[in-house]
Regions:
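Cytosolic, long alpha-helical scaffolding segments
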Residues: 1-138
């Protein structure tokens, strides 16, 4: 289900990437390249995770990816806010960028979840990851 949702989000994101990558506005181009790079970095890291024989390593790298994702969200929101205040992008661009940043975060989050499901077989390690997730929510 996460894979199907990621594909759906990717289709929505792809429309605006195509539109804004060819824009004359360098600021919006940079932001969409930033989104593309974040997704690409995640996919590359997941490929590295896939080749790991150590399931604890898979879990720890997955958690590091999640921390990276949180940092991206904070940075992206701050950057978009600055671009709006400095009138570097218009309201329509800002709305698209906020929505697409959200979709990119969903895609990355789901890819991380799928990677853990696919490459962690040991139930104890899976539970350890779930316990860690639950403890962060308190």
């Amino acid at each position: 289900r996460d894979i199907a949702e990621s594909v759906k989000n990717t289709k929505e994101l792809q429309k605006n990437i195509k539109k804004y990558i060819s824009s004359n506005n360098g600021y919006i181009k940079d932001e969409y390249n930033y989104i593309r790079e974040a997704i690409a970095k995640t996919i590359n890291t997941i490929n590295e995770i896939k080749n790991s024989k150590d399931e604890i390593d898979v879990l720890s790298k997955s958690e590091l990816l999640k921390e990276y994702l949180k940092g991206l969200d904070v940075i992206a929101t701050r950057r978009i806010d600055i671009l709006i205040r400095e009138k570097r992008i218009d309201k329509k661009m800002a709305t698209s960028l906020l929505n697409d940043s959200y979709h990119a975060n969903l895609i990355i989050s789901r890819l991380i979840s799928v990677s853990k499901v696919l490459w962690i077989q040991d139930l104890t390690i899976k539970e350890l990851g779930e316990d860690y997730e639950a403890s962060k929510n308190f």
